[in-house]
């Protein structure tokens, strides 16, 4: 019997010898709920695939049917833009300058998930996790707490810079995202529309339920 997996191709990651294993560990802990759901529905495990660059992540995902024909594979990337309510996620990446991604023939809406505008928006949902990571000198009160998916990348990045620049670990760096996501509470990310969508719609896909 062939072991089937849920594979999530995720954009990002730092550089270095242990970059792949560190990235996978951080995201797998955050996605533990979906891993357990996968196990309960006949999958061997949920596996995180570090895509590195954005284009490379998409390219790895779209050829998965050849490399992993028995697995359920989905894509999780930064939106890099606002996503209007009700918009089709594949339309977002098809029309975004620099992407122009075309949905593979086998993929549905539930095979693509977006972090709006980017992963840092998800990190900001859990300010306790940021406090735990950056420790002394972190200024929690400088981070926004409302309408996070409507805030631009610049707004979030500037707020993170101001909140972390005097901390024990210094200013936030993009390569730290996978370390922080490891301690972010999924329930906090679920307060965002697209965060909730990841857990709800991928959960239904894992259970084999009809798409809504």
Question: Residue spans of the language-model regions?
Answer:
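Short hydrophobic beta-strand that contains or immediately precedes a catalytic carboxylate
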Residues: 8-10
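Short helix-initiation/N-cap motifs at beta->coil->alpha
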Residues: 53-56
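C-terminal accessory helical subdomains adjacent to catalytic cores in phosphodiester-
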Residues: 1-5, 17-48, 58-212
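Short polar catalytic/cofactor-binding loops
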Residues: 12-15
């Amino acid at each position: 019997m062939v072991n089937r997996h849920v594979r999530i191709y995720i954009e990002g990651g730092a550089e270095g010898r242990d970059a792949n294993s560190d990235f996978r560990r951080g995201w797998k802990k955050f996605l533990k709920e979906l891993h357990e759901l996968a196990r309960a529905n006949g999958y061997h495990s949920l596996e995180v695939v570090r895509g590195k660059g954005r284009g490379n992540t998409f390219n790895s995902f779209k050829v998965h049917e050849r490399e992993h024909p028995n697995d359920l594979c989905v894509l999780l990337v930064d939106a890099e833009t606002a996503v209007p309510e009700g918009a089709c996620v594949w339309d977002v990446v098809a029309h975004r300058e620099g992407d122009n991604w075309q949905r593979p023939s086998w993929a549905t809406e539930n095979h693509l998930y977006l972090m709006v505008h980017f992963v840092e928006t998800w990190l900001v949902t859990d300010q306790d996790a940021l406090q735990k990571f950056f420790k002394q000198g972190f200024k929690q009160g400088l981070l926004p707490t409302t309408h996070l998916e409507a805030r631009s990348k610049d707004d979030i990045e500037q707020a993170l810079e101001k909140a972390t620049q005097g901390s024990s670990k210094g200013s936030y760096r993009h390569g730290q995202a996978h370390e922080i996501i490891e301690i972010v509470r999924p329930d906090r990310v679920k307060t965002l529309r697209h965060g909730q969508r990841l857990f709800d719609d991928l959960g239904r896909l894992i259970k084999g339920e009809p798409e809504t």
